Amino acid sequence: MSLRVHTLPTLLGAVVRPGCRELLCLLMITVAVGPGASGVCPTACICATDIVSCTNKHLSKVPGNLFRLMKRLDLSYNRIGLLDSEWIPVSFAKLNTLILRHNNITSISTGSFSTTPNLKCLDLSSNKLKTVKNAVFQELKVLEVLLLYNNHISYLDPSAFGGLSQLQKLYLSGNFLTQFPMDLYVGRFKLAELMFLDVSYNRIPSMPMHHINLVPGKQLRGIYLHGNPFVCDCSLYSLLVFWYRRHFSSVMDFKNDYTCRLWSDSRHSRQVLLLQDSFMNCSDSIINGSFRALGFIHEAQVGERLMVHCDSKTGNANTDFIWVGPDNRLLEPDKEMENFYVFHNGSLVIESPRFEDAGVYSCIAMNKQRLLNETVDVTINVSNVTVSRSHAHEAFNTAFTTLAACVASIVLVLLYLYLTPCPCKCKTKRQKNMLHQSNAHSSILSPGPASDASADERKAGAGKRVVFLEPLKDTAAGQNGKVRLFPSEAVIAEGILKSTRGKSDSDSVNSVFSDTPFVAST
């Protein structure tokens, strides 16, 4: 008795005809994979290989039995409402496009997209989002397109798009933004690959002109601003005119949609087209100032190195740059030229600028792969820094000398008024004068001169007594009805002026300035 062992290929070869062997193997592989890996198409959805559409089915979450290897999932017009860490029950590693528009979504929590890490396109348009914050998209490292238009977004946190290093297009049209999202281009969370930003039809009244010059030209050409309620301003007008001259499609294609509000007074205003040539009446100095802020007018100093960048919209990859000087001289990379050098990224360096180097320089960028070319004109002004510094130094010296003279004059006046020195002789004379004045007052108030008073003082005292010894007029006959309060005025006067040698000056003073009241007799 012999034992024969048959393997599966042997058994298949004995039972199945050779022509059907491959078909049976394929069937066995399909059964081995099973429905757990492949998934089924739910009754609420329509499936086509790697595309699943579950639109308008009143879904509040993603069905768990979807095909896990799908690449596109459309869940629009449902009732999802809130995106949290559990709204997708399983992981979809192959999913690269997720459409969630018209779902009344009001909030997005951190970790909502942890099960879809390979998304490249996310559509959250036409929902009810009010804010975007806390880096809710940080798991989407390879996201390229994000649609957030037609929401109620009024605030964007600077860190909201942190980690989206591959994001190229961002749609924010039709929201309630009141400020241009400058943090997308500068700062810690800037998006270096962002080439398209649509913030049209928001509520932005002005642009940050002092920071817009920090945005490279290849990113500037993809900023769409039309439909915002701008306030008429020459700086904004200069910016849009400059974009129009550079043939940016964001301005060329929507020229009539750029409007601004012109206020005639505090209550009345009218809306006008911003890019009309005749209505703004902006001076050349303001326009040139805006171009200088944008980096297209440069100030150079004689002898000081200057570097000028070619801010082209074509970018640096696969782009060749050449410069044309004011004298039509061709400046190319890697060529020896006196005082000039051009880098491969388009930057022009003037080692030691001279007055004759001033003028308009044209940078020509040619991208052969994209069949694009652009010419950027840059104005360079050259001035002498030593002359300007000498004038400034002279002006400073003059001002400082004048100020020092004024301070010295004030100090001298104060010293003269409050700190005038007085010698000893001056002090002695001052004391004698004070003594004479006190004696004179005593002689006036005393009835007679003191025993030790000098002859001059007695004369002075006698002269002073004349005031009190004027003869009293007799008004008894003609008083005209006046009441005579003191019938014996002469007697009282004599009593006051009668000299008593035994009394001191203090007693005389006390007698005159007595607090005892006079009583009128009738």
Curated annotation (Swiss-Prot):
Taxonomic source organism: Pongo abelii
Q: Where are the annotated LRR repeats, by residue?
A: 69-90, 94-115, 118-139, 142-163, 166-187, 193-214
* Residue positions with a glycan: N104, N281, N288, N345, N373, N381, N384
Query: Where is the segment annotated Disordered?
Result: 501-522
Disulfide connectivity?
Answer: C41-C47, C45-C54, C232-C260, C234-C282, C310-C363
A GO biological process held by the record = heterophilic cell-cell adhesion via plasma membrane cell adhesion molecules
Alphabetized, the UniProt keywords read: Cell adhesion, Cell membrane, Disulfide bond, Glycoprotein, Immunoglobulin domain, Leucine-rich repeat, Membrane, Nucleus, Repeat, Signal, Transmembrane, Transmembrane helix
What are its GO cellular component terms?
A: nucleus; plasma membrane
User: Where mainly located?
Assistant: membrane
Occurrences of domain LRRCT (ranges): 228-284
Q: What is this protein called?
A: Amphoterin-induced protein 2
Whom does it interact with, and what assembly results?
Binds itself as well as AMIGO1 and AMIGO3.
- Please give the Pfam families that the UniProt record associates with this protein: ig (PF00047), LRR_8 (PF13855)
Function as written in the Swiss-Prot or TrEMBL entry:
Required for depolarization-dependent survival of cultured cerebellar granule neurons. May mediate homophilic as well as heterophilic cell-cell interaction with AMIGO1 or AMIGO3. May contribute to signal transduction through its intracellular domain.
